[in-house]
Amino acid sequence: MNQIEIQELTTHLSQALDQNYDVVNMDAVLCVICALEGTTITKEQLEATRLAKYINQLRRRTKNEHLARRAKSLLKKWREMVGIQQTATENLAHPSQISSSQPALDLVKSPITSFITEPIAPSQQIVSDLHSNIDSAEPPLSGEHTLLHPNFSNLVNSIKDSDRHENIAITTLHTHKDRRHSHSIRSCHVASPQPIVIDHSVNSVINLTDDSTVKINEASVVIDIASDSDENDNNGSLNPKKLNSIVPAPLPIPSTPSSRQRKLKKEKRSKEREGQVATNTRFGAKASDGFQQAALTTDSEIFSLSNSSMSSIVSGDATSSYSQNKSRLNSNELTFTGRFKAVDHLFRSTESGKHKIDEYSAYDSNASCSRLSPSTVDEVKKAEHLFDAQLTNTTANQIPMSAVSIGYESNTRHEYLESDSPSQIPKRRGRKKGSKGVDALIAKESSSLSQQIFFGGSTVKKVKTTKELFNEIQSRKLSVSMQSSASNLSNSSTNRDLPSHTTFPRQTSSCSDTSMNSPHILETLSGSAIFASKIDDLGNTDSDTVTSDPSHDSNKSQEIKECTSLDSNSNSIQSLPLANNRENLIPTNVNDITTQLMHLIHSLNSPLSEIEIERVYQEKIIPCTCIVIEGVQGTLGESNNSTLDEQSYNAKISLNSKDNLSCHNQDNYSTSQRSVNGEVIDTQPKLVKSIFDLDFDDNDDPLYFIMDEIQKPIARADELKNNKSDTKNINFGASAQNASLNIIHFNDDAQQDNSNQERGKNETQNAIPAFTVHEDPDCLARQRFYIQTNKVTSFHINALHNYYIPNINGNWDSVESFTSFQSEHTIMDTMESYTVTNGADVVPKYGLLTSDRIRKDLSSLKSIKPYRVKNFTSLISPFLGVAKCLPTCRRARRRFKNFVNSSTANDKISNNFESLENMKTSFKNCNPLNVKIDGTTSAIYSHNENHVPMQVNTNVEQLPPSQSFSSNAISYNLLKLADDKVCHDGISDKSSNTGCQGNSPYSSSSSSSYSGRKEDQHIITKNLQNKNIQLNSRKSDMKRRKRIYLENDSKKKKHYRKRIKTAVNRTFSNLHRNLYSIDSENGMKNDYKNEYGNSNNEEYAIVQRPAGDGENCSNHIVLTIKKTPSKINSPANSMTAFSPPSTSDGANLQKSILDLRLEDTNISQSITEIPQKKDLSKTDRIVHQSRSSAYRRIFRKPDKSQTKFIDLDLKHLFHLKANSPCISANAKLHNKLFFPHELSRDNTSGIRERLINYSSSSSSSYDDDSEVENTSFLKKANVNKFSASNNRNLKTETETCAATAISEFKFESDEDSILTSLGDSDIDIQDEIQVINDKVDYCNDFQNNKMLESFNSIFVDSLRTNTKNASDNMGSSAHITSLESLKPENADAITRYCNNNNLGVNLSNELSNISAKPLKSFDSTMKLPSLGIEHCTGIKTSSDMASTNIAEKKLTRIQQFKEWHQVLQLRSYNNEPLIVLPYVLLE
């Protein structure tokens, strides 16, 4: 019970008692005690309610022995529950007990004795009595029986008693009960057997006194705890003959049940005593009824032993006694189930239909199981009436046990009713010695038995949760059913098969341990046939709980079910189709559980589908019964009021007629209308507002007051005017009737005045439709609305977010309309057709109705998934989102300023650039997010800073500002992240190679590396650290690449400084290389951090707007994600970008991406043949260093054994820079999507700007990461080249290439000059550099500049191999030459880059490396595999690049892109571009 119920019981009890605790209302007291006996109670509840005090006082004050006994049993139970074990034992040997034992002897004499094939002891013939009832059997025929077989004889006796008490104190020899049983019908007063006290430890049934060592071979005693009391009652009425007939087969008694039996016996004895006394009183008065209730509750309690009853029965005592009993009785001999049933009770079950309706049924285990709700008084009374009927019938019907026990057993209410039992059975409040409160546990009284079993038996102080109960029930069902199934099947099953009820004991209520309390379980456990039979009764007697099986339901139980709903909590399912036979039940116990579970599962409804939900919803749609009344205010308030009143009245009538709407609103409305009196507008009743009505209430709406305030002054003015100019007043105003005229303001003031006045009147009087909603309080639609709106469940949310709803939540009209990446063209088309300019394009603004498609899946805006991607192991967690811009840009700008502050830097920058101001301007233009960085160096650093912002001054030790910076290059560097590290690590070499290559983007990277030399070194150090970290994690090949890279880094560091110095000394092309190297180093760094095989460095490219946009064009911060061309050709590879007007290549670049793709396709075809390294002859050396670098990169690519990276940006985002045609000759496939000339263009200041850093040139230049040394060398060369390019006219001497003079050239002429300037030595150097670059690129390809392998890199293994070989042949002088040649070309490219505000990625360098000649030679040497459409973008031919000759133009650039990440450039809210990348690695 819960606290409230306990409190109520306490209240009732207190009311039933007077101040002296004398019983005032015996019925109420008995009801309360029955309820308490049938329920569990917690210590806290007792403490809170002080219920124990009332019970104790009642026990002390009452003169009713039965009531006192029951109260005492309750207190015992509670003590045990509370943990206060009372060692005091009841004096079981009372004359009454002796007398009851005598009836037990009579029982033994009765055929029951015959029923017991073997007496447990010589005197164990009492077992036959057990069949009648344990209580009946309990009184041994002789004292020796009680002594010899205290368990069994006592069990029998106690069964009788228990029948009365529902609690079988089997543990104690109910000799006194036997004596009491002597009072029972068959009670033959044998010499009162000595009361045998059976320890609780010993199973009461099996506990035989030391005298009874013989096991009962007689028919196994099935002890049905639940039913024995009733059965005892019933059996008491029954003749021993029945017991004999019923018992024929020994019932298997599991040893564990025996312990329960003991406890039950004890409880039965004590409760029987109490019950007998109570029944004696009951027979004379309601006390008997109360006792019957108690007895009834006893059965129910036994089943309601949810917590302790069965557990107590099965407690250690039970188990220990079980072992003892086991020695005494075979498990087959004793069977405990639910309640102890005598075997005869099995037969009686048929009779039980007649009599089992008695009190016992009222006390069904189920009924008592729901201890929380003990059987109601009516139920108890009903049970009592049933019991009385049974008493009348029991004498004939019940087993001899009843005859034996009725005289004694309180359980045998029949005896009490007969009133011989009370006389025969002395009141015994004390426990027998050794009873250990088992009496309390198994008090025969239904309440005391169940409660004691619940509380005392197991001494369970804790109320078990439903889950615990269910688990225990199942486990017990399994164990008990499995254990007892064999024995029960063998013995008891046959006996119980007789009664269909017993076959399937009903499960007890959930309150009780179903397994233990369930009739079948108890029956299975019960060792006495009586118990078994009682189980049948239990089934019958169980209240209408689901647990009770109809098969078991006896008539009594069925009748009681009406009264007792307590068992409704029972876990068992009555409907389970179990055979009536206990055999069926036992073998199907496991199956029963499964069946029950299946029933439960099937009872659960499967979730409704959307269609079903919709259907249900449609079915549930209810028309709104609310009424909207349009109250048209008449011209006069009165008329309005009357109209409104009529309307409201009519509405009321209609509503009332419908009985749907309450009219009080209308009444109020009408009343308010009546009160309005022409002021209806102001005083109109408050309309019922719709939840959608956001307007003020009429009374609260300030509009009326505002209107009044406005109108009053107007009216006053009108009056004044009217007074002043009455002559001017016109009829128009006078016509108050004409609202329109009133409204119209005439030029005449008087007319206006009149109109205003009349207007105010008319406003109050004019018929303004007023819609009044009369809500029907019973409107189902409204209720549903409130319910649904107030109860938004996950279903609604999921429906909104996950379900496809056309035109809702951005869902497109059809699911099929969802666009995914379908083809190159479709990508560009979708990009163009569907533009994401701001968040509203993805997420509609609040309150904005968006009928257009809103992409919920922007995957189409992303590049194709790379075919092969290395496991991404990043030291830094990838940041998905907009590339970081401002902090980096600011840092870069500060660094640039710092660098620019140095006069040398300024001079160099001025030398390298037309003007530092131009650089700064372009750089500022290049600043992402319009972040103004005052120097290209800062941009370069920022380019390096993409991963780690780098200060040019810090990073660039000696790089001349011109070398280290171009505004575009700076801007490129500003956002280039991945490339920076690579630039430092691998790109420096690459850039040096590029420097040799001249136009190769390495030159820019080298310049970047120069600019970031210190930082490059720092980054390199970080990169090395990162690489070291990643080397550990990388595969052996990656480790090898790392080692190469580390070596390259170490070399790079050295060479970087040297090259940077040289670059500072004047190699602007080296600036490009430095840029590339920085980028590549950053990329390398990122590669180490981000381990994607071929992914090149991600870089934020500041995309300069086309020259047409002007210097002022805000830079686009683009994180260029490169994929190896082998990976995926994405239409983004060739992006519609403005080809820099500076070169014809730029025009080509201007082609749309599709054009570029076509062009690439054509290029792939034309490029099919690419001059190999052999082409990289001195002739090729003559080719610009960029060419040789490109070639070398190609060569390195084979070394790297990975596709080269192609820097990709959205074509439309990038203005391709045109590289000098020199690239065509030596050109190896450009690692980048665009050639330098494509990326560069002349800015407004005339400086060639890099339109975009669509790729981390460093990574592309590094595409071969094979050699970090090469990278470092390239970086030096790039530094030189970058410095040369910065200086344009200055010769760049790298320490490596110091001997070689690099031709001076201007940015504009860099590529051309490189083409012309490159000498054989340059070519050799380029080859060498290219080899280095190839190695670097190899590393980069694996490391991929921390970018995804899929990042673009041109892959021509054969070309790269040949190139690498040629580059290997090429000496440092060749590198120098390449650097020289690259310088001009790189300078141009860098200039373009800087002008483009790109991150100083000298694509032109690399592109220039792919000079037309080298390309031509490559073309002749090798054919690029013709690329399919997927690779069309991968191949680009820049005839402009190969301007030197037509062949070179054809071969000018071969770019093979197999995959790329499409970079989405969004226009930021300030109209500045934001680049959204699939992966943006931020440090």
Curated annotation (Swiss-Prot):
GO biological process, alphabetically ordered: positive regulation of gene expression; regulation of transcription by RNA polymerase II
Q: Which parts of the sequence carry Phosphoserine?
A: S204, S258, S421, S551, S1177
| Modification sites for Phosphothreonine | T541, T1179
Which Gene Ontology cellular-component terms appear in the entry? chromatin; core mediator complex; mediator complex; nucleolus; pericentric heterochromatin; polytene chromosome chromocenter
* A molecular function (GO) term: transcription coregulator activity
Q: Coiled-coil regions in this chain?
A: none
Family note: Belongs to the Mediator complex subunit 26 family.
According to its UniProt entry, the function of this protein is described as: Component of the Mediator complex, a coactivator involved in the regulated transcription of nearly all RNA polymerase II-dependent genes. Mediator functions as a bridge to convey information from gene-specific regulatory proteins to the basal RNA polymerase II transcription machinery. Mediator is recruited to promoters by direct interactions with regulatory proteins and serves as a scaffold for the assembly of a functional preinitiation complex with RNA polymerase II and the general transcription factors. Required for activated transcription of the MtnA gene.
Any idea what this protein is called? Mediator of RNA polymerase II transcription subunit 26
